[in-house]
UniProtKB/Swiss-Prot annotation:
Keyword presence, Nuclease: yes
Organism: Synechococcus sp. (strain CC9605)
Enzyme type, top EC level: hydrolase
Annotated protein name in UniProt: Endoribonuclease YbeY
Enzyme Commission (EC) number: 3.1.-.-
Nuclease among keywords: yes
Cofactor: Zn(2+)
Organism ancestry: Bacteria, Bacillati, Cyanobacteriota, Cyanophyceae, Synechococcales
Length: 166
């Protein structure tokens, strides 16, 4: 399976010295392809059949600032203030997915400023926090959700597995 990644970054949210490989498109492409192979390759995990069988998947990954994500959070979730990650699935109902060689998954939007704060609060690197947030967003694009504590625990366990596998 091949991934077509559209990466957009507002580098102004980070100092030049902080960026390094954090916002490198090739690094994120390899990481996302690896995570998709894990989820799609394990029949015990929920993943839309059309995604499992697709020759090509496509998604957008956007790194932005708190002001921009706060606007999106207000518009799409009717919540005030910034959040860490938002996912916009191309299709929420698996029955609506169109068959074809390429499947559009949707977009993952991450606030670099919130990610930096959370990394500092958790005592780990910004890279680790970004990987956590992007993996969480990816699972949402694949249909995972956490309306209750049990489903949240299951989703977080899968995130830990993804991060542990590279």
């Amino acid at each position: 399976m091949e991934l077509d990644l559209a990466l957009d970054r507002e580098e102004g949210a980070l100092q030049a010295s902080e960026i390094g490989d954090l916002l490198d498109e090739t690094v994120w492409l390899q990481q996302l392809e690896h995570w998709l192979q894990i989820v799609c390759g394990d029949e015990s995990l929920d993943c839309p059949t059309l995604v499992r069988s697709a020759e090509e998947l496509s998604l957008g990954l956007r790194f932005i600032d708190d002001a921009t994500i706060a606007d999106l959070n207000s518009t799409w979730r009717q919540k005030t203030g910034p959040t860490d990650v938002l996912s916009f699935a191309a299709l929420d109902d698996a029955g609506d997915w169109m068959e074809g060689p390429s499947i559009e998954l949707g977009d993952i939007v991450v606030s670099l400023e919130t990610a930096r704060r959370q990394a500092q609060e958790q005592g780990h690197s910004l890279q680790q926090e970004l990987r956590w947030l992007v993996s969480h967003g990816l699972l949402h694009l694949l249909g995972w959700d956490h309306p209750d504590e049990k489903s949240l625990a299951t989703m977080l366990a899968l995130q830990e597995r993804l991060l542990g596998d590279g």
